[in-house]
Design a protein with these regions (language model features):
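Flexible "arm" and connector segments at domain edges
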Residues: 1-163
Length: 163
């Protein structure tokens, strides 16, 4: 599983960044991406509380997609910026509600403007724990999200990408 992640995640990150650049999303102010991140966090919590595993898996991947683009926006295209902390794990699994609570806290920090890498590292680690709890790895969740968005058409309207 780790071997596949080592091969697949850098490719997925590159595809998502290219997708963002083709659509001009990478040039939008990163502050606007925060709203998309919040939307995806909301979908994650909604899926969890409804017990909708398909939407939960999709939400995990969608969050990572929005974070990849967020990092792309505030890092000014610096390559491998996201990949550097993809492999960070924190602690062991402490229970689903613990990791969801940690994501809720991180959501507030991101919304408040904390773009620091440490926040994103913890979000990724918590997302990994949640995915693992359900028998998935986070890379396959991102792959699932990529398959959903890769052919989407849309445009930037008033600084926001709409599809």
């Amino acid at each position: 599983m780790i071997t596949n992640e080592l091969k697949e995640m850098p490719l997925l990150i590159a595809k998502i960044e290219e997708w963002s650049m083709v659509r001009g999303i990478h040039n939008l102010p990163y502050e606007t991406q925060r709203y998309k991140i919040m939307e995806e966090f909301g979908e994650l919590f909604g899926a969890y509380y409804r017990g909708n595993l398909e939407l939960l898996k999709d939400s995990l991947g969608d969050i990572v997609v929005t974070l990849i683009i967020y990092v792309q926006q505030f890092s000014n295209g610096e390559r491998n910026f996201f990949e550097e902390f993809w492999w960070v794990d924190k602690d062991e699994f402490k229970g689903l509600s613990y990791h969801l609570d940690q994501i809720a806290t991180s959501t507030n920090l991101i919304y408040a403007g904390a773009s620091g890498i440490w926040v994103l590292r913890y979000v990724i680690a918590d997302l990994k724990h949640i995915a693992k709890h359900y028998g998935w790895n986070l890379t396959e969740c991102v792959e699932h999200a990529w398959e959903e968005i890769k052919d989407r058409k849309g445009r930037v309207v008033d600084g926001v990408w709409v599809h």
